[in-house]
Design a protein with these regions (language model features):
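N-terminal positioning helix adjacent to the helix-turn-helix/winged-helix DNA-binding module
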Residues: 146, 171, 193-204, 240, ...
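Basic/polar phosphate-binding segments, predominantly the helix-turn-helix DNA-binding elements
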Residues: 174, 178-184, 193, 209, ...
Length: 309
């Protein structure tokens, strides 16, 4: 019982220190890049509407407030007692659901390098490189004292910028090791292992991102993954929670929304630019994902952002 109590006290202590460091190095709400290239700090004094984007591999540790992330129809909620890992590029929606001016949402976000993960896998266990079945490429796990300790030490380097070039890579490597050693570390491990089904799905995802405007050719994607088409569908859905076609639609629709918001472009023109042949089909699928047809959605977005067309 004493060990459990000490562990809980350590977690709370590290969370408080990390919160203080993030408050110190964030000037108001928003995403704050730091002198450590892979590290950004996020702060919000209010809850938010859902935002849609493609998230690259990353670790997110929240010390105050909470957030919900949607991957297809699956929901993942995390806050001060847990952390989130995304192991490959995934189109998700994210919403801060707990935040206030007195207790703002605070998040430590670290980009993950799968090559570094592979190096650690090889060093930690160079003999056993067993390729397991595909697993979902996003997970939430309980925070640990060693992980938070490393996050605190990395953030503390912002007070001593001259130490960053030497010490930051070592601590980032330690953080990655802690994630790999976690209960769901196999997700990241399998994604890093060349030739594993998860790694081959990551290759397909990269191809879909490059060619999202082109017609979907399952045979070509299957060949790139060295899988049969039926096997590709199964593994792709296990990792991303969606089919290749659904993934492509998410990419197209998110890019369309970005273009409509940033360029005040015509909806039909944007539909063709992102690969749709039918503006009416584009409008239907847009409304299904974002809740409103294109023009109504962009009007709502501008109101939320306080922007004038």
């Amino acid at each position: 019982m004493r060990d459990l109590s000490n562990h809980a006290n350590s977690l709370v202590s590290y969370q408080k220190e990390l919160s203080l460091l993030m408050e110190k190095h964030t000037d108001g709400d928003g995403i704050h890049e730091t002198l450590i290239p892979s590290l950004s700090l996020i702060r919000s004094s209010k809850t938010t509407f859902p935002s849609f984007s493609v998230h690259e591999p990353e670790l997110c540790i929240v010390t105050q407030g909470s957030k919900v992330v949607m991957l297809a129809d699956e929901s993942f909620t995390y806050g001060p007692s847990s952390y989130l890992v995304i192991s490959l590029d995934l189109p998700v929606s994210a919403q801060i659901i707990e935040a206030s001016p007195d207790v703002p949402y605070l998040c430590f976000r670290l980009k993950l390098n799968l090559k570094d993960a592979l190096d650690l896998v090889n060093e930690a266990n160079p003999v056993s490189r067993k390729k397991l079945r595909s697993k979902r490429g996003l997970f939430v796990e309980q925070s640990t004292a060693p992980l938070l300790d490393a996050a605190v030490r990395l953030t503390r380097l912002l007070d001593n910028p001259e130490d960053i070039p030497i010490l930051a890579p070592l601590i980032v490597r330690e953080i990655l090791y802690r994630v790999l050693q976690g209960e769901q570390g196999d997700v990241l491990r399998q994604m890093a292992l060349r030739g594993s089904s998860s790694n081959r799905i990551a290759v397909v995802v990269e191809q879909l991102k490059r060619e999202y405007m082109e017609p979907l050719r399952i045979d070509e994607l299957a060949a790139a993954a060295h899988m049969a088409p039926s096997s590709l569908h199964r593994h792709f859905k296990e990792v991303t929670a969606m089919s290749p076609l659904q993934y492509q639609k998410q990419l197209r629709l998110q890019e369309a929304r970005r273009l409509l918001l940033s360029e005040s472009a015509d909806a039909a023109d944007v539909a063709f630019r992102v690969g749709y042949e039918s503006p009416s089909q584009f409008s239907r699928e847009y409304a299904r994902l974002f809740g409103l047809p294109p023009i109504s959605d962009i009007t709502r977005l501008r109101e939320q952002l306080g922007r004038v067309p």
